[in-house]
């Protein structure tokens, strides 16, 4: 009888423990605390403005909190995210093309685009080839004709050396038959390149549609061609590389990442919450005002897209590293 009572007591205790465990799981259902979003640039930049716009509209059980960790062109913040706990409470807002360039340029041996979990992409930005009003050129063909007739006269700005922006530009320059006829000038970011173009220190630049939106509106920047497969909504009258017979179409999505091994539950929760924001007409209006284009891409599709770009861009980064 005592033995039977002991068995019953053991079962009751075990059941109580399981029940307590289940209750704890319910209490700690994700997210049970604020989710930090690392923005790897200073406040006021494109990634910062975009994330704060998402924070304005997102509906989560816990708040999404912005944490700016800038430096080294966004790499310091990216590495901070890489080394963070994979518990779903720290994510990264970043441009996948920058994430790719850190590895392809040799800044790190870690393949961050695959060593971070892709949550989703939310908007597209586009590299655009532009000139200034001082040049007098209205079309790509006019610029190319001048460059061929005046070797060495054109300085062409890019937003950084060993970047996707520069790799795209090298490929476009080659496709236009201008290799050796123009001088590429790398700057530290889009704002610096844009300023140089306005001051006529350079005559052409490759820069983001979001970075040039205000100067295009004022007439100081003349967009000649978008490096994309479709025309950006912000620049509907600007032809694309494909329209010009150039097979270079690397868009610039902006998206969100989590440390490797973050649970699928957390990834799905965040992706679904962000997807709802991207479908919000007010959010769409906000990002279009920034020169961006709302376009939700889930994590798997986003990762696959970037993997294809990596394969395409690797030989060009090798060329850049060799100084060719």
Describe the predicted segments one by one.
Residues 32-34, 180, 265-324:
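An extracytoplasmic/periplasmic, membrane-proximal ligand-sensing/linker region
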Residues 1-4:
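Positively charged n-region of N-terminal signal peptides that target proteins for export
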Residues 58, 80-90, 103-192, 241-246, ...:
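Hinge/capping helix and adjacent helix->loop/strand transition within the periplasmic-binding protein
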Residues 96-107, 170-176, 203-237:
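A ligand-binding cleft/hinge motif common to bilobed small-molecule-binding domains
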Residues 21-114, 153, 177-206, 296, ...:
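N-terminal (or domain-start) structured segment
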Residues 211-279, 308-312, 323-324:
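C-terminal lobe and pocket-closing loops
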Residues 8-16:
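Bacterial N-terminal signal peptides
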